[in-house]
C-alpha cells in the first residue's frame, strides 16, 4: 500500500511470535538488509527467532498496513485433505485458549472429542455411507454443544477496538496472509494480539467454518465459470 507505512511479517513456520520492540530497537538499527533499486526502499530485518520483518516508511498517514505471511499455501495441502491451508486461514480467527471462549476448561474436552471423532470419520471408507452418516451426526451433535462456549468474532472485535480496518486474510498457492490496517500508535498492542493469536490457536466452531470455506470455494468456481 503506497500511501501507508507498510509492514510485512513473514513467518518461517506457525510458531509463537516473540516481540519486544524497545529492547531490540538499537540492536536492529544497523542490522538490516536492502534490495537494490527497491522503489519502496524497504529495510529487511531478521529477528533472533527467524522472523523476517520488512519495513517501508511513508510519512503522510499515521497508520500501518500490516501483513503476516505464513509460507504455507494450497500447494502444501496433503493429497487427502485438499483445502486444508484455506481452512486453517479461517480457523486462525477463532481465538486461543485465552480468548474466544466463555469457559475453555469446559470447551476443551469437547473440542478434543470432535478431533478424535473426525479422525475416525476420515478412516471410514467413502462407500460406507451408513457409518459415515452415523459418525457425522455424532460430530455434529458434539460440535453444537461446544459452540455454546464459543465467542464469535472476538478477534475481530479486539483489533477493531484498537482502530484496525480492513481485517482480512487470503490463501494462495504458496502463502497464507493475514491483513490489518492499524493506527501507528497501536503497533505494540497489535503485536500483542497477533503474538497470542499464533501462540496456541484453538480450532473452535468447526462446522460453521467448514461450511464457510465450501461456500467461498463454490463462489470462486461460479465466478470462474461466468468469466470463462
What residue ranges belong to the model's regions?
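His/Glu-rich zincin catalytic helix
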Residues: 4-8, 12, 16-150, 177-184, ...
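Catalytic zinc-binding patch centered on the HExxH motif and its immediate surroundings
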Residues: 46, 57-59, 162-172
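Short, glycine-/polar-rich solvent-exposed loops and beta-turns at beta-strand/coil boundaries
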Residues: 60, 81, 170-173, 206, ...
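Acidic/histidine-enriched alpha-helical segments
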Residues: 104-109, 202-218
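Short acidic/His-enriched helical or mixed secondary-structure segments at domain edges of catalytic enzymes
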Residues: 214-228
Amino acid at each position: 500500500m503506497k500511501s501507508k507505512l507498510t509492514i510485512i511479517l513473514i513467518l518461517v513456520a506457525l510458531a509463537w511470535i516473540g516481540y519486544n520492540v524497545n529492547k531490540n530497537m538499537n540492536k536492529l538499527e544497523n542490522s538490516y538488509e536492502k534490495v537494490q533499486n527497491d522503489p519502496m526502499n524497504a529495510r529487511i530485518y531478521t529477528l533472533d527467532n527467524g522472523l523476517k520483518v520488512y519495513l517501508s516508511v511513508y510519512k503522510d498517514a499515521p497508520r500501518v498496513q500490516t501483513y503476516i505471511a505464513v509460507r504455507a499455501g494450497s500447494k502444501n495441502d496433503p493429497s487427502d485433505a485438499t483445502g486444508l491451508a484455506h481452512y486453517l486461514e479461517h480457523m486462525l480467527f477463532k481465538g486461543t485458549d485465552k480468548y474466544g471462549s466463555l469457559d475453555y476448561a469446559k470447551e476443551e474436552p469437547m473440542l478434543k472429542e470432535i478431533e478424535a471423532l473426525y479422525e475416525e470419520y476420515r478412516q471410514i471408507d467413502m462407500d460406507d455411507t451408513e457409518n459415515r452418516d452415523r459418525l457425522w451426526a455424532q460430530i455434529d451433535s458434539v460440535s453444537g454443544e461446544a459452540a455454546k462456549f464459543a465467542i464469535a468474532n472476538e478477534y475481530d472485535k479486539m483489533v477493531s477496538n484498537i482502530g484496525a480496518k480492513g481485517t482480512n486474510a487470503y490463501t494462495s498457492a504458496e502463502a497464507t496472509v493475514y491483513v490489518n490496517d492499524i493506527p501507528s500508535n497501536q503497533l505494540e498492542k497489535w503485536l500483542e494480539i497477533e503474538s497470542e493469536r499464533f501462540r496456541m490457536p484453538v480450532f473452535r466452531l468447526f462446522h460453521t467454518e467448514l461450511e464457510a470455506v465450501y461456500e467461498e470455494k463454490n463462489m470462486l468456481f461460479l465466478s470462474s465459470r461466468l468469466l470463462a
